[in-house]
Amino acid sequence: MKSFTALLLCSLPFGLQAQLNKPATNYVTISSGESEKEIIYKAAHVTPSPRQLRWQKLELTAFFHFGVNTFTDKEWGDGKEDEKVFNPTALDAKQWVKTVKEAGFKQVIITAKHHDGFCLWTSKYTAHSVKQSPWKNGKGDVVKEVSDACRELNIGFGVYLSPWDRNSALYGTEAYNDYFVNQLTELLTQYGRVDEVWFDGANGEGPNGKKQVYDFNRWYELIRRLQPTATIAIMGPDVRWVGTETGRGREMEWSVIPADLNMMAKIAGDSQKDVAFAPTGDKRENDLGSRDKIRNAHGLVWYPAETDVSIRPGWFYHTKEDSKVKTPQQLFDIYFSSVGRNGVLLLNIPPNREGRLSEYDVKNLQRFKQLMDRTFQQNLAKNAVIKCANGMNTHAMTDGKYETYFTTKGQDTTATIELTFPSAQTFNILSLQENIAVGQRIESFVLEYKEANEWKKITEGSTVGYKRLLLFNAVNAKQVRLRILSSRLNPTLSEFGLYKGD
């Protein structure tokens, strides 16, 4: 791959090499008085870190919410649960992991500790854990069984550790941060490679009625030291929450967003180090990274969105929800509105009281995978002759390789890419992918087809990012074109796909 990249860059004009091959960084500072042109140039060169790029390519990840809530039939426990209620009769973590892997998922996250403070491993620092349960006579370790299954089946492994702990008497004091670090250290050192650490933002009261001031930076430093390749998600510096639990991302989803003064102060303090900062501000706004948003920014960071949603109405298993499992078509629609909107999907599939994924969930995941395979088995664009007057490497858009990409010549920020098929083709899905390793750049585009010597609009969009999927009424055409109307410097495309779905 390195040799291809070298050949590609050698073939580019010097000015274009400079635009595409500027040293990669996942943050930049913006000085007072910089022009919009200078800011856009910087924004175009903010790129994901290696761990962020690896994470983005996962596309599909799974959440396993499992704990005392599974047995008390609650969503949020109060920390006063009798540990003896936790007693799965046939726990099979391999069944969990095998099911989601066969459905196309690349990584799983287990709720090692939820807000109730109950630990799914035999932590040395609390009695509120599996060691006080009858399951395996107090010798069991759910986290180990999940991590072992992930190693065996070659799938990513992550942990969710709730900062809020409604059981710990230390909560609300500085000593709790030590307690939390001790538990986090156990998770980071006892289970092999950890690919993601997930912190949510809940911060309620503990048993003493106090709230906790979380020492996020201390936690980040620990993770970076013990598991340097792990992404830190949601209340962390690598991945942000999309802002909703509906499974829907934004129509305009920028991974490059403004950094506030607190973020920039942390970045400055970590100069020449691996940057880590706690997220601030409202990440639920519809627009986080447009030109209007970044115009007055103090800095810019690569901060991509994770879209979390449960396959059921609740996050933990409830028997009454067996008839409310999301259908394969609903899961397919969620894929389009999460991964297809420049995000990564984190789908929760909660194990039941036996300790297995329910047959209802399993069947719908299997059918979802079948629907995905049918839909994306053939990229019709591969059969077309592709031309772009100001473009380079047009073949890269249909070669199936993410690392190769199309771009424009000179300093062109627009492009018209025309496809001509041997005969008319019917399609109803557009798939686009930028090569985000060199930045996120495309701001608007339109797809058109030719009918009776007239170009007619099929669909249009704003951002692309890692992946953009658009579904529309089926079109039958021999000539199609994609017009990139606006881009931050030269646009790139790793994939241009046209598909016919059910």
Which role does the model predict for each range below?
Residues 19-413, 418-419, 423-433, 440-441, ...:
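Mature catalytic domains of secreted/periplasmic carbohydrate-active enzymes
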Residues 1-22:
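Bacterial Sec-dependent N-terminal signal peptides
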Residues 435, 450-452, 501:
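Inter-blade boundary loops/turns of WD-repeat beta-propellers
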Residues 446-448, 497:
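Beta-strand signatures of extracellular beta-sandwich domains
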Residues 490-502:
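Exposed low-complexity, polar/acidic, P/S/T/G-rich flexible segments that act as propeptides
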